[in-house]
Amino acid sequence: MTKHPPNRRGISFEVGAQLEARDRLKNWYPAHIEDIDYEEGRVLIHFKRWNHRYDEWFCWDSPYLRPLEKIQLRKEGLHDEDGSSEFQINQQVLACWSDCRFYPARVTAVNKDGTYTVKFYDGVVQTVKHIHVKAFSKDQNIVGNARPKETDHKSLSSSPEKREKFKEQRKVTVNVKKDKVEKALKTEKRPKQPDKEGKLICSEKGKVSEKSLPKNEKEDKENISENEREYSGDAQVEKKPEKDLVKNPQENLKEPKRKRGRPPSITPTAVDSNSQTLQPITLELRRRKISKRSDTPLKRPRLDKNSPQEQSKKRSENSDKDLSRRRSSRLSTNGTREILDPDSIVPDLVHTVDTNPLPDKSPSAKDSAEGQLKSPLEAGQVSSALTCHPIGDGLGAADLELNCKSMGENTMKTEPVSPLAEVQEVSTVEVPNTLKKVDDSVTLNVPAVDLDHKFRCKVLDCLKFFRKAKLLHYHMKYFHGMEKSPEPEEGPGKTHVQTRGSAVPDKTSQESLTRKRVSASSPTAKEKEKTKEKKFKELVRVKPKKKKKKKKKTKPECPCSEDISDTSQEPSPPKTFAVTRCGSSHKPGVHMSPQLHGSDNGNHKGKLKTCEEDNLSESSSESFLWSDEEYGQDVDVTTNPDEELEGDDRYDFEVVRCICEVQEENDFMIQCEECQCWQHGVCMGLLEENVPEKYTCYVCQDPPGQRPGFKYWYDKEWLSRGHMHGLAFLDQNYSHQNARKIVATHQLLGDVQRVIQVLHGLQLKMSILQSREHPDLQLWCQPWKQHSGEGRAHPRHIHITDARSEESPSYRTLNGAVEKPSPLPRSVEESYITSEHCYQKPRAYYPAVEQRLVVETRGSALDAAVSPLCENGDDSLSPRLGWPIDQDRSRGDIDPKPSSPKVREYISKNVLPEETPARKLLDRGGEGLVSSQHQWQFNLLTHVESLQDEVTHRMDSIEKELDVLESWLDYTGELEPPEPLARLPQLKHCIKQLLTDLGKVQQIALCCST
């Protein structure tokens, strides 16, 4: 039965309705209705900012649901105080962005929950709360009415007289700003120009307002209102009469002895008496800046709260702390950039170029000098050039950071100049020259900061604007496919050298700027540094086949960029640090446990170690100078001449795949010889003392998803070498003594398997011969021998012929036996059986003719016979997989497998009447050819006959070789006499004893495991 929700004041029972709900911990949270169950009379409540797993069903008349009236009433009251009413669609407003700054936007929708959907002027659409939307025309009133939450006790005074005076100043400033906004809207056609005017005051005050914030708030995100609130502190600090500063802009620039470079347009004491004069001056400054199209400087870092005397003392005593603090507070190139207003550029220049270096400078001026000494100097940032603060110190810091990051020579050529000396040197610079150099340096800035606080893309025909430099960097990298151009690295550096040629040598700065470097404060740069080190560590590893499982691997001792910078700050030779780096990062290629090497590898180890250390010490000193593209190439820096032949065993990338599923490399590592993956020795129960001679990991021993027979594929060396597993405590291993016989037997088995495959191919060819209408018969329109090296007409046969011709020289390798046999005929002494077996028996054991047959079997006859067999057995697959007989049954009905004589009888009976006329016709020189089908059958029949002869010859050779092997075993006494039952009791006793011993071993293993 459907129920109707109750009528509760302030709560509308519909999906998405806002309310407050109390959870089971008796805490009230803002929530909304997720779902309504009309049959049960309940609602599903979702608590805001909590996961959906905390959603809870409430009865809709539950007392634990209440409306949001109180919060809404309180917020409405705040709106009334701020003087902002509800905004309409298409109304121009100031909306708060994620950096807590307000930007011009237009309302596109008014939502039910009290939020607004606004569209910023760069096209970004966002939903913001109503407390983050302000009226566009009343921007400065909102800022002015906001009371400061926390101010510095040195900057603000609580006396009522000063408060009254500041209120008057603020009112006048607001009127001036309104006039500016109106004129700017008329004269300039830029959409965000009013916002620039709205923030005219805050831009200059940012550097002093930052002084009043505590140190733990190290965020470059401040509201406009916060900057305005700190304005009062700035006004109290400089309480000196500055009415004489209100002059022409040209006079302002030429006046050298200004105590404090405060812009005349925002001097609080001058506003009262000269408000009419301020307006044209400000507009003139703005027009000049717009015509120059100069990019706005970046925001300065915060100043310390210490007194000027303490700061100068601290500066002289703790220069190292200054450097580290500068590094930590520095903004990365792709980080968030906050932008000063363009009108504050000229006042900053006037404020900085102070030609009075005497100690009676005002405290505020000293504070600003201290703040400028800590200004960011990064590649791509030209704030130092724009504000023209002491450039020598900035360049010195940059060189120090470059030298910390690069591994090259001249590590500490450039020493940071003392700050006081820099202030004195910069005081001699003339103001017009400074402005000229500022304009030069502005053109080199890559993140183009537009006057309306946008970063503009420099690519032609691209009209994209971005609010942050990081977004512009992403756009350039992923949209245009361009990394950072060389302009931000070299441009500012060259400008600095031209401006302050006396501070730093030109050559050193050029060298340091051309080096590849990474910012110490950028987190992305740290990650790039670590990935580059990891790539370099992987590139210089060498894996000798005999020693690759016996390496000790340790973690790099100094992988971090901080450690590198700390180490390289000391003026030590770079080669020493390179050797330290080699000893840490590349220990896998150098340190090997001496217990794990055989006698033949002992002297080999010393060569490897010295050679690798020498090579690494030279190569790793240049490792940080490599670019990203050079890292992708294989660089052979540690090639041992003894191991150049084993090129297949060099692996540039190593994988740690252990049962513990931890990807770290620590302590003793062991490598699988099959998949080249590394495992922790502790996890596998192996120590340096008990490493097996051949190690295979748990995955290769039992590969998942494979057939059961593949489980033993890793242990295939006994097929080619004849060494089978035996008991370690036995002095004489049976397989080691009889390795040659095992290998020879396996080769015979491989040859027999080949013959079986060729016979199966013969069956298919016989089925083709049975019917004249078989579609594959036309493939034999030409004789086989003319096309044996050129392939066939049918693409399938061409493919298989090529595969056979490639497989034929190395067919035994596929069976796991030996390497490719020599194509040349071998002599009697070089044949396999003669060289390895027959030397133990009399040479006259076989007649000379039989010996020659045996030699043919393993010599040229083997390859000459097997190659056509492989080519003719065109339907056989890889010998590793065996022969799938059912695969090609679609070719025709296959008779039972015929032996050689039966095949010949069958051919002579069935095909002889067709063969004879064809032969006669050919003998007569082609007089009156028979039909084409008869010719095709004749070609195929000729091929089958030749193949049959080769198979017969091959079987005879295998039989003779088998006789040689068996007779040699009889001669050496390895095989028992013809009565094997005579040893049966002894054999039973040995088997029982072996079973007893295995039972004891199993009990011991159980006891040890428990």
From Swiss-Prot:
It holds the Pfam family MBT. Residues 267-280 have a biased composition (Polar residues). GO terms for biological process: chromatin organization; positive regulation of DNA-templated transcription. CDD domains: MBT_PHF20L1-like, Tudor_PHF20. Keywords: Acetylation, Chromatin regulator, Disulfide bond, DNA-binding, Metal-binding, Nucleus, Phosphoprotein, Repeat, Transcription, Transcription regulation, Ubl conjugation, Zinc, Zinc-finger. GO terms for molecular function: DNA binding; zinc ion binding. It is found in: Nucleus. The modification Phosphoserine is found at residues 159, 876, 878. The modification N6-acetyllysine is found at residue 841. InterPro entries: Crb2_Tudor (IPR041297), Mbt (IPR004092), PHF20-like (IPR043449), PHF20_AT-hook (IPR022255), Tudor (IPR002999), Zinc_finger_PHD-type_CS (IPR019786), Znf_C2H2_type (IPR013087), Znf_FYVE_PHD (IPR011011). It comes from the Eukaryota. The keyword Endoplasmic reticulum does not apply. GO terms for cellular component: cytosol; histone acetyltransferase complex; MLL1 complex; NSL complex; nuclear membrane. PANTHER family: PHD FINGER PROTEIN 20, PHD FINGER PROTEIN 20-RELATED. Contributes to methyllysine-dependent p53/TP53 stabilization and up-regulation after DNA damage. Methyllysine-binding protein, component of the MOF histone acetyltransferase protein complex. Not required for maintaining the global histone H4 'Lys-16' acetylation (H4K16ac) levels or locus specific histone acetylation, but instead works downstream in transcriptional regulation of MOF target genes. As part of the NSL complex it may be involved in acetylation of nucleosomal histone H4 on several lysine residues. The Tudor domain 2 mediates reading of dimethyl-lysine residues. The Tudor domain 1 doesn't bind dimethyl-lysine residues, due to an atypical and occluded aromatic cage. Homodimer; disulfide-linked. Component of some MLL1/MLL complex, at least composed of the core components KMT2A/MLL1, ASH2L, HCFC1, WDR5 and RBBP5, as well as the facultative components BACC1, CHD8, E2F6, HSP70, INO80C, KANSL1, LAS1L, MAX, MCRS1, MGA, MYST1/MOF, PELP1, PHF20, PRP31, RING2, RUVB1/TIP49A, RUVB2/TIP49B, SENP3, TAF1, TAF4, TAF6, TAF7, TAF9 and TEX10. Component of the NSL complex at least composed of MOF/KAT8, KANSL1, KANSL2, KANSL3, MCRS1, PHF20, OGT1/OGT, WDR5 and HCFC1. This is PHD finger protein 20. It comes from Mus musculus (Mouse).
